[in-house]
Amino acid sequence: MSIFLDQIEKRKLLEEASLAETFEKGTRRMGIGSSKRHAVPPSDHGAMRSVLDALGVTGYELTDSEMTTPEEQLNAILRPKGILTRKVSLKDNWWKQSIGPMLGYDREGNLTALLPTRWGFGYTFTDKDGETRPVNRKAMASSLSRHAITFCKPLPHKTLSQGDLLKFAFKSMSMTNLALLLATALVLALFGMFTPMANKMIFDIVIPTGEARDLLPIFGLLAGAGIGTMLFSLTRNLCTERIRRVVEMHLQNAVMARTFFLSPKFFTKNSSGELTARLDNVSKICSLLNDTIVGAFLTLLFSVVYVAQIFTYAQSVTLPSLAIIAVEIIALVLYYRSIVRARSEYTEKYNKLSGMEYGMFAGIQKLKLTGSERRALTLWLDKYTQATHRIYNPTLDRRLIPALLQLCNVGGTAVIFYFILANGVTTSDYIAFSSAYGMITAAITTIIAVIPEMAQIKPMLDSLNPILEETPEMEQNAPMVDELFGSIEMTEVSFRYSDDSPLVLDNISLSIAPGEYVGIVGKSGCGKSTLMRLLLGFEQPLKGSIYYDNYDLSKVDKTSLRRKIGCCLQNGSLFTGDLFHNITITAPWSTHDDAWEALRMADMEKDVRRMPMGLHTVVVEGSSGFSGGQKQRLLIARALIGHPQIIFFDEATSALDNISQKQVSDNLDSLNCTRIVIAHRLSTIRHCDRIIVLDKGHIAEEGNFDQLMEKKGLFYEMSLRQM
């Protein structure tokens, strides 16, 4: 009965807190409260609507609440849709780049929508008088701020195929740029038709008459075609580069965002080095498409216009010519498939090799300490040889097909000569036909040259399959967690890591009140860290439910929940960078004063102030410049920077001396937040309000330190080992 009474009491506390919060909001809206925020101006709403409409967001509602800023409202609307925001500085002539809709600021700090023009060349904004104006140097100098918010469109939050990825890339293109690219490619193909025409005119008109002056108009025609070809080639290259940059930006951001939203379980199956190699392929794919393949394929595609010329000049040779071209295309397909097989094997093994290389360099000190450099190098050489075997030792078909293509060209020319002689084609028609046919064979030769690059794309896309096939952790339209009071409840939770493994946690029920200090202890393998992973949503329980206040963990937006929790897990690490960004990474809005306060709470302030660069002290790979205790205190500071209502510590003070540990514990006592601590040292949990003893996946004992010692049970036996 006590469990149900505790739950009823907890519900009453939550209802009272909710009523107090609602009353506070009401008084602030009437001007009685102390909030310094103001209602959102109508112009800000207009700017936000314009940007949201441009992003294709529907089903949202903007309010005039004084409790939220426009940026907070925007984040609340976009977060369930998976659209990420980022603050940027607008430098130089930024409006000449197509980077999608943005939310900017005017000189008075009000929001304004920065929208691309209809044709994708330039931006417009709405001034304070409601007039739409183009963005230019004058507008930037007089009306607009140099700061804005950009948006990253996400990939769909479901299992994706390579086709879905390519479809997303296609949608990110500007249709204006795409139409311009196709138009310039067509014009270039049409310019190429002038050469066969000029050859025919020379042999039909100039040579028979012997009039040299007749060459002048033909020369002018060819010169104009040459200049036009040069200019349109430049336009095509610029357009291709523009498309590549836009597609690469959207695709790279979307794939990276999807990777970060994958469940923690995904990262246990893929090493950091391997994931880096896979993600790098996104940029490589865009570069390969832009640098070689798009141009070559557009040339081949529009070479169809030369078929019409072939038919016009030598109708009797058209069918044999098309047959030869068809044979060459079939050989190209076979050549492509043979290279793809070799590249697929190489790419997959290379990704694994990258993961191994990263691990070797990360553990280079251990390799040197144990004198294992030669063994590591031998292992690397063995894996490298396996990965590159098919690249340096191509199969027979890969060596034969290029030679057969050359033979096909020579043999095809002989066949064409035979049909020309047999059908009595005139000299002028033959010369014109030869020029047109040469354009087609030149396009095929270009394709042959880029096939090795083209064959890399399919294996690179295959390497992204683990990321595409994994479903992101984010649930569409899941409720956001705006505030926590600190209540946690687990009801009959069971969990196992695989279907054929035993239960790690078996029917665990646990209720933690707001502000309670709870310690969790037990022998190694009893399920302490697993319990923490379940509470953080890193794993899904086999059965049972977990609630934070009134939020069901299985249905809530887990990222917004974790932002309200300060967490310091076992074997945590610092990032490469400086101390300030390491501490504030979980709360990027924090100031230097906030960072110093977090360091003080973690008993690390004095140490950092003694460092010459203070908060700007550089953290190198592996955090080799810091002791184990300093590293743990920095991680504790990171957990405290956001002023969380719930704190999780998993062996977070194991490297601290007793004095530092007591100082940290005393500082945490002043926060009046819910604390859950996993520890082995009795000094860490001695002052807990409640200690939970786990054994073989069950709660074996429960009570405060003195009560458990009096029971002389499992906790008492564990404590004797430390006395």
What would you call each of these model-derived segments?
Residues 536:
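Helix-to-loop junction immediately C-terminal to a conserved catalytic motif
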Residues 175-195, 201-249, 257, 268, ...:
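Transmembrane-helix motif of ABC transporter permease domains
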Residues 1-195, 208, 212-217, 236, ...:
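Membrane-integrated ABC transporters
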Residues 253, 257-274, 345-393, 479:
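Loop segments that connect adjacent transmembrane helices in multi-pass transporters
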Residues 195-201, 293-336, 392-439:
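A hydrophobic transmembrane-helix motif
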